[in-house]
């Protein structure tokens, strides 16, 4: 198990054009929890400011953005470009560690879990899927680092 600082705290981000799902984990337990979603703002700079407010409230030390890599190595989507730009803004405005993490199919997996395992309606799933996707992204990142 890697040693870690007692004050490490992670924010998982599942970016979408309308909503951004959020998840949080902090040392020493690093249990990843969905913490809801925020609406995407009219500009990436405003969206970065909204995220920074949450980062400060929770004393986050590392931000993990889901990065929707294409299934086939072709071209980057406009969403992927926006995520990269938003991640750079957050990094520049906070000087925190910002990581782009492969999130292929995390939103689809979250939707499937909510539909099949939880039996939620489409409206209920819409309200929960973004933060669950962020939870899956952050959990995957933490698992890869063997921080649990």
Curated annotation (Swiss-Prot):
InterPro entries: RNaseH-like_sf (IPR012337), YqgF (IPR005227), YqgF/RNaseH-like_dom (IPR006641), YqgF/RNaseH-like_dom_sf (IPR037027)
Main localisation: cytoplasm
Signal peptide annotation: none
Compartment(s) where it occurs, according to its Swiss-Prot or TrEMBL record: Cytoplasm
PANTHER family: POLYNUCLEOTIDYL TRANSFERASE, RIBONUCLEASE H-LIKE SUPERFAMILY PROTEIN (PTHR33317:SF4)
Biological processes, Gene Ontology terms: rRNA 5'-end processing
Protein name, entry field: Putative pre-16S rRNA nuclease
UniProt keyword annotations, A-Z: Cytoplasm, Hydrolase, Nuclease, Ribosome biogenesis
Organism: Chlamydia muridarum (strain MoPn / Nigg)
